[in-house]
């Protein structure tokens, strides 16, 4: 049985598949979930970050939740390190927290705020503030950590956050999502004001924008079996992407360094809403849209089918148990 979780405006949606039919349940109803993470060592331990409700943890697959008492309420990003089990949470205003006891206690990683670029961090809709949009612990190295500030840059630490390198050369400053390849330690990927990738564990980045006529990218995911095959969602610009016009959204795939190719195969062309969440697993790919639609591909994006799961905005996706 495959299990999928979606962070939505309604709360956490839990989807379980049996005989190619999805059963849907709503958890944390009305919470306005923004982000999700799972403990790689215990798939029943989940973390949910809420827009204005703090951070919550479940140890029974989402049936029951407790407040983890994070010092900030607006949680924009979560991650659990596969290398050492550390839990990270990023907030608005931009603060980064770490827990080494599964969310029972927290300490702030204050060194992030000592970067020289910090005074320039500013989120355009709320220019007086910014937020930690994405946290990406390297799955092989417990000290290696990438953090994306919206809008401020892509920051890197090699010692678990004790010290930081400021915005990395070649990376996009408007960071929306980051990914490591699960099996190739040095390969990393970014979506934001455009797309970029790294082959040296995030030290430096190369832009990858050729072939896309939509340059405002949002979500990024990578083929677990092929570090040279990755995907982004994109729109014509930030205002259209976030509900102020026709987003003209697409999903693109890049293979072997070739230009980006738009994906169709059953998807509306263009999509009526930006895919806020892309997720590639060992056997499938999912796209969660800003209007609540969920699409699925079983052939690495060549063809797609609607899951007939609809609801509020899907902000994040998490797959477990063979999905």
Describe each region flagged by the PLM.
Residues 1-323:
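Extracellular glycan-interacting surfaces
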């Amino acid at each position: 049985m495959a299990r999928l979780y979606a962070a939505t405006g309604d709360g956490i949606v839990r989807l379980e598949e049996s005989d190619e039919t999805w059963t849907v349940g709503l958890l944390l109803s009305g919470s306005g979930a923004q982000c999700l993470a799972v403990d790689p060592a215990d798939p029943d331990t989940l973390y949910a970050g809420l827009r204005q409700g703090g951070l919550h943890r479940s140890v029974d697959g989402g049936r029951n939740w407790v407040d983890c008492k994070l010092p900030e309420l607006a949680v924009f990003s979560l991650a659990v390190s596969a290398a050492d089990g550390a839990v990270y949470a990023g907030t608005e205003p931009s603060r980064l927290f770490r827990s080494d006891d599964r969310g029972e206690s927290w300490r702030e990683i204050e060194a992030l705020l000592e970067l020289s670029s910090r005074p320039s961090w500013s989120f355009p809709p709320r220019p007086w503030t910014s937020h930690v949009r994405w946290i990406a612990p390297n799955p092989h190295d417990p000290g290696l950590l990438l953090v994306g500030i919206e809008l401020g840059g892509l920051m890197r630490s090699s010692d678990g956050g004790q010290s930081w390198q400021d915005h990395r050369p070649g990376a996009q400053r408007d960071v929306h999502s980051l990914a490591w390849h699960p099996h190739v330690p040095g390969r990393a990927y970014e979506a934001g004001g455009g797309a970029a990738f790294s082959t040296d564990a995030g030290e430096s980045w190369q832009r990858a924008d050729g072939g896309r006529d939509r340059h405002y990218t949002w979500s990024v995911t990578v083929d677990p079996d092929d570090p040279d095959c990755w995907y982004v969602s994109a729109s014509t610009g930030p205002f259209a992407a976030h509900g102020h016009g026709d987003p003209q959204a697409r999903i693109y795939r890049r293979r072997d360094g070739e230009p980006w190719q738009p994906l169709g195969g059953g998807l509306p062309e263009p999509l009526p809403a930006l895919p806020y969440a892309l997720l590639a697993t060992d056997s499938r790919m999912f796209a969660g849209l800003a209007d609540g639609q969920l699409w699925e591909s079983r052939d690495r994006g060549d063809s797609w089918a609607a899951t007939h799961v609809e609801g509020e905005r899907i902000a994040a996706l998490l797959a477990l148990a063979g999905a």
